Amino acid sequence: MFRGANAVSLDAKGRLAMPSRYRDELDSRCNGQLIVTIDAVDPCLCVYPLDEWEQIEAKLRALPSLREENRRLQRLLIGNAVDLELDGSGRFLVPPRLREYAKLDKKAMLVGQLNKFQLWDEDAWNAVSAADLAAIQQPGAMPDDLRDLIL
C-alpha cells in the first residue's frame, strides 16, 4: 500500500527517484516495473505497479466496446500508458509527452493512493490539496458514509 505525499525532483532528463521507502515493495511486487499514464480526471499522472495495472487493463477490456464512453476511456488510459522500470538507482524516466500533460518541471509531488501513485506538479498539488480541504470542511459537504470513515 502506498500512502503519503512525497516531494520529488525531476532532473534535466525528466527522471525522478522513487522514494526509498517504496522501492522494496515495488521490487518484490513487480521487479520495479511500472506503468505511467494520464489521470483522465485530474491534471496529473498515475503511476501503477505492473500487477495493479494489469487489473485495470482487465477491467477496461471487460467494458462493452460499443459504448463511446468506454472507448474514450480506453483510448485515454491505454493510449497514453508507458511501460517503465526503476533503474539501479531507483529512478524512472517520465516521457516528455506525459510531463507536458501534467505540466511537470523540476518540483513535483508523488502522492500515494493505496494501490498507485499520482504524480503532480508541486504547485498544482498544493492548490488542489488546499481546495479539497476547504471543500470537505464545508458543513454538509461530506456524506454520512464518508464521515463514518474518519477517526
From Swiss-Prot:
Keywords: Cytoplasm, DNA-binding, Repeat, Transcription, Transcription regulation. GO terms for molecular function: DNA-binding transcription factor activity; transcription cis-regulatory region binding. It comes from the Bacteria. It is found in: Cytoplasm, Nucleoid. InterPro entries: MraZ (IPR003444), MraZ_C (IPR035644), MraZ_dom (IPR020603), MraZ_N (IPR035642), MraZ_sf (IPR038619), SpoVT-AbrB_dom (IPR007159), SpoVT-AbrB_sf (IPR037914). The keyword Cytoplasm applies. NCBIfam families: division/cell wall cluster transcriptional repressor MraZ. Forms oligomers. This is Transcriptional regulator MraZ. It comes from Pseudomonas putida (strain W619). The gene is mraZ.
